[in-house]
């Protein structure tokens, strides 16, 4: 049986070992297809990262698909049932690294646009693609750099679908219409190293800071809202001491992360945490990493178009959720447009034997195409 256009492209993309930040020629495949449709292509290479921006049309509004060609490492090869970069179909599922995250989505995007333009060559508005090879890595030279370049010249995306695997049980059951913000603090409490038998000659930073750490961990940061759960404060890493049982440590390192709703922002969090720490009698250093602001698309033409498209294909409307980690949608949201995420089932992403249901790729293609029809068909 001949592969469908979506399946054939997905296989071609998966076969390329684009472990972050490598692209391995994936973007060239997409660019070739988009050029044939009349897209203007702008390749943007920043250090080790390959990106491209493609646009068809000059009219407003500007709708864009966004995604990434890089994948996480395959992990232990011996635990895979197939070779991770040799796309294989087993029992109706396409197996391979990136099948769900997110080469299947990329294939669906391209084919959906091909089908839409074939039927509506004189569509209204403009269609774009923002593709990077730096989403699974440090996200320094990827989407954020392209967004900065576009904003600098006043080219803002009005509506965007990010192809992240948003679904849980079946494709389209969940559409992510927002994401929480993320901020990380690396806290170092200073003390004085000494012998445990002579605590009066030392200053144990673990002891001196426990009450402050407990206060931060038990603080109610907000109550959340209709779209977001309450802000979460978690401590993923702590370290102190030399490993010897008779040495009081000289420093205590605590790393914490907050996933926060639209009720807060970076400045408020920094102020509240600093005020809490300053109440206690210890010396500390605190370094911040701002991973991204929360964003929300609670209404608008894009959300209406997607909900209709998913309902048309599945006969069931999707749930609108903001759960999960961060995505490149947080950078695109800086343009103040509508940003949502719609992609395959995420049950196997980043795992060995990553796979996606072949039928889901066809459904996703139909959802993307109908979204375009709802937005731009004359």
Swiss-Prot record:
User: Record keywords: Acetylation included?
Assistant: no
Q: Which residues bind Zn(2+) 2?
A: 101, 136, 350
Q: Which reaction does it catalyse?
A: N-succinyl-(2S,6S)-2,6-diaminopimelate + H2O = (2S,6S)-2,6-diaminopimelate + succinate
Q: In which pathway does it act?
A: Amino-acid biosynthesis; L-lysine biosynthesis via DAP pathway; LL-2,6-diaminopimelate from (S)-tetrahydrodipicolinate (succinylase route): step 3/3
Quick one: a GO biological-process term for this protein?
diaminopimelate biosynthetic process
Q: Does the keyword Disulfide bond apply?
A: no
Q: Which UniProt keywords apply?
A: Amino-acid biosynthesis, Cobalt, Diaminopimelate biosynthesis, Hydrolase, Lysine biosynthesis, Metal-binding, Zinc
Cofactor(s) in the UniProt record? Zn(2+); Co(2+)
GO molecular-function annotation terms? Answer: acetylornithine deacetylase activity; cobalt ion binding; succinyl-diaminopimelate desuccinylase activity; zinc ion binding
Annotated residues that bind Zn(2+) 1 are located at 68, 101, 164
Q: What is its EC number?
A: 3.5.1.18
EC top class, in one word?
A: hydrolase
The UniProt note on the cofactor reads as follows: Binds 2 Zn(2+) or Co(2+) ions per subunit.
Catalytic site residues?
70, 135 (proton acceptor)
Name the family the entry cites.
Belongs to the peptidase M20A family. DapE subfamily.
The annotated subunit structure for this chain is: Homodimer.
Biological role:
Catalyzes the hydrolysis of N-succinyl-L,L-diaminopimelic acid (SDAP), forming succinate and LL-2,6-diaminopimelate (DAP), an intermediate involved in the bacterial biosynthesis of lysine and meso-diaminopimelic acid, an essential component of bacterial cell walls.
- The protein's name in its UniProt record: Succinyl-diaminopimelate desuccinylase
Could you tell me which species this protein originates from? Answer: Vibrio atlanticus (strain LGP32) (Vibrio splendidus (strain Mel32))
């Amino acid at each position: 049986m001949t592969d469908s256009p979506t399946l054939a492209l997905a296989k071609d993309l998966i076969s390329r070992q684009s472990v972050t930040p490598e692209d391995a020629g994936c973007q060239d495949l997409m660019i070739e297809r988009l050029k044939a449709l009349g897209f203007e292509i702008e390749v943007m290479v920043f250090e080790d990262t390959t990106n491209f921006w493609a646009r068809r049309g000059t009219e407003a509004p500007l709708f864009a698909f966004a995604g990434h060609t890089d994948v996480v490492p395959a992990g232990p090869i011996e635990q895979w049932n197939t070779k991770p970069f040799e796309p294989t179909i087993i029992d109706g599922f396409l197996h391979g690294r990136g099948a769900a995250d997110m080469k299947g989505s990329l294939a669906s995007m391209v084919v959906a646009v091909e089908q839409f333009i074939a039927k509506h060559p004189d569509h209204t508005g403009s269609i774009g693609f923002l593709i990077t090879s730096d989403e699974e890595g440090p996200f320094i030279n990827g989407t954020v750099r392209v967004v900065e370049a576009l904003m600098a010249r006043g080219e803002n995306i009005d509506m965007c679908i990010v192809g992240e695997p948003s679904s849980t049980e079946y494709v389209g059951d969940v559409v992510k219409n927002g994401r929480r913000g993320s901020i990380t603090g690396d806290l170092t409490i200073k003390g004085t190293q000494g012998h445990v038998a002579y605590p009066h000659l030392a200053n144990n930073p673990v002891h001196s800071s426990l009450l402050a750490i407990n206060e931060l961990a038990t603080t109610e940061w907000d109550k959340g809202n209709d779209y977001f759960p309450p802000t979460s404060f978690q401590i993923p890493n702590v370290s102190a001491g030399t490993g010897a049982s008779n040495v009081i440590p000289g420093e205590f390192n605590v790393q914490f992360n907050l996933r926060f709703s639209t009720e807060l922002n970076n400045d408020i969090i920094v102020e509240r945490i600093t005020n809490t720490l300053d109440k206690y009698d210890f010396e500390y250093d605190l370094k911040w990493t701002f991973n991204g602001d929360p964003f929300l698309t609670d209404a608008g033409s894009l959300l209406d178009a997607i909900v209709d498209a998913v309902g048309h294909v599945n006969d069931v409307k999707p749930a609108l959720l903001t759960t999960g980690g961060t995505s490149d949608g947080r950078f695109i949201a800086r343009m103040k447009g509508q940003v949502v995420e719609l992609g395959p089932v995420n049950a196997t992403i980043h795992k060995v034997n990553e796979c996606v249901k072949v039928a889901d790729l066809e459904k996703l293609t139909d959802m993307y195409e109908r979204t375009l029809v709802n937005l731009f068909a004359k």
